[in-house]
């Protein structure tokens, strides 16, 4: 099973692909879709959509896991991230993929064992669980891998991400 985890964003959209073989998780590929600040929102969304379609075509994941929108005080940021989530969900739907959505607290619970874990704790566990030499950067990439790990725990071992 191959899971594509995504941490939505318009400037940086992190992605991480993991493979699940029995009890073993391994990172296949990870990175970030970056969009220039000076471009229109429509252009940024098109870049995210096009790049994710290419990633899906290349790695052929069986599932897509997306972090749910965490509403913050900046409504404008929440709206633009919501738009990014929309094109991400569209890319997954066009490929006929099963989409799983998780709250940040669910991801932290699945990866660290504590739903209010610090970002550094999550990043360190991503490195350990996937046997990576270094913590993936930028943070959005480690977050995307964490979402994929949460999905793997949920689908493979029936662990409810609470």
UniProtKB/Swiss-Prot annotation:
UniProt key word Cytoplasm: yes
GO cellular-component term (any): Holliday junction resolvase complex
Catalytic residues, chain numbering: 7, 67, 140
Binding site for Mg(2+) 1: 7, 140
List of residues binding Mg(2+) 2: 67
Cofactor remark from the record: Binds 2 Mg(2+) ion per subunit.
Catalysed reaction equations from the record: Endonucleolytic cleavage at a junction such as a reciprocal single-stranded crossover between two homologous DNA duplexes (Holliday junction)
UniProt key word Magnesium: yes
NCBIfam families: PRK00039.2-1, ruvC
Quaternary data: Homodimer which binds Holliday junction (HJ) DNA. The HJ becomes 2-fold symmetrical on binding to RuvC with unstacked arms; it has a different conformation from HJ DNA in complex with RuvA. In the full resolvosome a probable DNA-RuvA(4)-RuvB(12)-RuvC(2) complex forms which resolves the HJ.
Family matches, as PANTHER family: CROSSOVER JUNCTION ENDODEOXYRIBONUCLEASE RUVC
Name the UniProt record assigns to this protein: Crossover junction endodeoxyribonuclease RuvC
Source organism (scientific name): Heliobacterium modesticaldum (strain ATCC 51547 / Ice1)
Gene (name only): ruvC
